[in-house]
Regions:
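N-terminal, positively charged nucleic-acid-binding surface of large information/translation enzymes
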Residues: 9-12, 18-104, 450
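Short, well-structured beta-strand/strand-turn elements
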Residues: 60-62, 132-138, 449-451
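Structural preference for alpha-helix termini/caps and helix-kink/transition segments
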Residues: 267-270, 275-454
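Alpha-helical recognition segments enriched in aromatics with Gly/Pro capping
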Residues: 1-33, 48, 120-327
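Active-site pocket-lining segments that scaffold enzyme catalytic pockets across diverse folds
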Residues: 96, 101, 106, 125, ...
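Short, glycine/charge-rich beta-strand/loop segments that flank catalytic centers
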Residues: 67-71, 93-96, 106-121, 139-148
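Alpha-helix C-terminal capping/helix-coil junction sites
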Residues: 55, 101, 129-130, 256, ...
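The substrate-binding groove and active-site-proximal loops of carbohydrate-active enzymes
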Residues: 79-85, 109-115, 198
């Protein structure tokens, strides 16, 4: 059974979906005012693996990841460049989709935009006003955290001692400094929209709650994102949705959060200026290498970025490809009985690792162990091990999303054949016809026929 670490309960829990054989999952997407950095890519890759696990296990998956396409940062960028917010957001949405395609992210993801869901956002704000959880100050609409007794539970904070989060807006209009804005009244030189409560635009937190409700319903199985979103963003989402919709106790059953990618033990972020753009890294390393690098560390642990570790991932994938090249060629004759046990153990341990809170480093270790065991088997006897090639290919590509270099595998095969043919020709020149004929016979078994010139 799948076990996931739930931030809400601070413990590892068995995963039980709301509906049998169906998973509804939402992952917070980017605010599209810049290219994404590799720290932004971590939740995209980690939760892509989770989605792949569910698909592999036969679940019907509904997966939503949003675009925040109206925001203070987008407005600032548009004003700086003399462009519209739509032009800025469109540019970086297109860039985002290009980047994640290079990272082999599954395409079956619903990607709504905030500006396409304003009616749903307004409905939720009206619900919160009617129920008394929100109040108006001028053209602003603000959520009152004191009205929701469970506020702070997700981030494990007490109402009386809340820490101001990075994106909490301190405003004299608020009854409580930690109250948060649902609707921002119109300001000069900013886009605005009409609503029952005045001209303005949505606040950051309300967007995700509304889009989750529209595309996935009142209750969902999994909500995921980076740990920096726990407070205030996800705390506020939880408050809005639990108060504004008719949910069954909690609108999210499992809250999952990945840890940071760091540089010199410091969190990578655009605000600190210590980030590495994903598309810049892609100029030197392909998406499979970057993906492998991210998956070598458990998602709830900090991962330090370094080109040295990217090189390790690159060489590791090259070694796996070379082994697969060998296994693919050894496809004649019978399989050794021991191979069945080796493969059975691999398949069991690989899936168990991923069911243990998405333990990707352990799953990758299972691949290395399999290769070592098969090579050890081949050192003692000849055996048909082509099935190992297909088993590794299946697990690496379909579950971990790491595509192995098929061209390299085919090139290695051709190089080995060329070496054998050169050796055979030298044997014939030395009149060692017995050994030369033996090589020809063995190649014929592999389906490669050689005709000697007379």
């Amino acid at each position: 059974m799948m076990k996931l670490y739930n931030t809400l309960t601070n413990k590892l829990e068995d995963f039980v979906p709301i509906e049998q054989n169906k998973v509804k999952m939402y992952v917070c997407g980017p605010t599209v005012y810049n290219y994404i950095h590799i720290g932004n890519a971590r939740p995209i890759i980690v939760f892509d693996v989770l989605a792949r696990i569910f698909k592999y296990k036969g679940y019907t998956l509904q997966y939503v990841q949003n675009f925040t396409d109206i925001d203070d940062k987008i407005i600032k960028k548009a004003n700086e460049e003399g462009k519209t917010c739509d032009e800025i957001s469109e540019k970086y949405i297109e860039a985002f989709l290009e980047d994640i395609k290079e990272m082999n992210v599954i395409p079956e993801i619903i990607r709504p935009r905030v500006t396409e869901n304003l009616d749903e956002i307004k409905k939720l704000i009206n619900n919160l006003l009617k129920k008394g959880y929100a109040y108006k100050k001028g053209e602003d609409v603000i959520f009152s955290i004191n009205k929701y007794k469970d506020y702070g539970k997700l981030s494990n904070q007490d109402l009386n001692s809340l820490t101001n989060g990075v994106r909490i807006e301190v405003d004299e209009k608020k009854d409580n400094p930690n109250d948060f804005v649902l609707w921002k009244g119109r300001k000069a030189n900013e886009p605005y929209y009409e609503s029952d409560f005045g001209l303005g635009r949505p606040g950051w937190h309300i967007e995700c709650s509304a889009m989750i409700h529209k595309y996935l319903g009142n209750n969902i199985d999994i909500h995921a994102g980076g740990q920096d979103l726990i407070f205030p963003h996800h705390e506020n989402e939880r408050a809005q949705s639990n108060c504004g919709y008719d949910v069954n106790n909690e609108f999210v059953n499992y809250w999952l959060h990945n840890s940071y990618i760091t540089i010199n033990s410091e969190k990578m972020s655009k605000s600190l200026g210590n980030f590495k753009l994903l598309r810049d890294i892609l100029k030197s390393y392909n998406g499979n290498v970057i993906r492998h690098f991210i998956l070598t560390c458990h998602y709830r642990k900090n991962l330090n970025f370094s080109t040295e570790d990217l090189e390790v991932s690159k060489k590791t994938l090259e070694k796996i490809s070379k082994s697969m090249s060998t296994f693919k060629m050894l496809n004649k004759g019978k399989e050794d009985e021991a191979l069945e046990d080796i493969l059975k153990e691999f398949k069991t341990n690989f899936i168990l690792a991923l069911e243990d809170d998405i333990n990707t480093p352990k799953a990758l270790a299972c691949v290395s162990i399999l290769i070592k065991k098969v090579n050890k088997l081949l050192a003692t006897k000849e055996s048909n091990v082509e099935r190992v090639y297909f088993e590794i290919k299946d697990k690496m590509e379909n579950i971990l999303g790491i595509k192995l270099n098929e061209d390299k595998i085919e090139n290695d095969k051709n190089k080995i054949l060329e070496i054998l043919l050169n050796i055979r020709e030298k044997l014939r020149q030395q009149k060692n016809y017995e050994l030369a004929d033996k090589i020809r016979e063995e190649l014929a078994i592999l389906g490669i026929d050689i005709s000697d010139k007379k």
